[in-house]
């Protein structure tokens, strides 16, 4: 699951943060930059990043610099269509547009997804031949169709949060994420 590889998850299990304990993290590429600063006396701004996502023709690693122009890095590398470029991962990055089309300081990845601007009529009623489901309720799960190309479509508008145990299966920390999210949705920060 996604959060299992994040530094915050490891900190939570090894040495949890509290009022008296402060924890710092340093990325591996920043460790290299610090080492080069002490060895050469110069600021090292090179980075190796991943160019990834279903809309990338040839996903691979790229050698670039901090704050690189993402339009230049992805020129001629993307499939045709209305694409959304994200500096960072699809879950923790930021959409880049116009003046913000640069690689983020702490990002090691460029993600590219197809914009999901279409609405499917009665999509909840379809057999879901090309849809992803965490619970395995769509036909694509039974047919073993993998990988499925993800888009930015959220398949609808705001709706009620139904507790079916999906969050509990992917969040590795020892708390109940459904209760936390429900409290945050209604603005009850005391309960959260």
Task: Please give the residue ranges for each predicted region.
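Buried, small/hydrophobic-residue-enriched core segments of structured protein domains
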Residues: 1-192
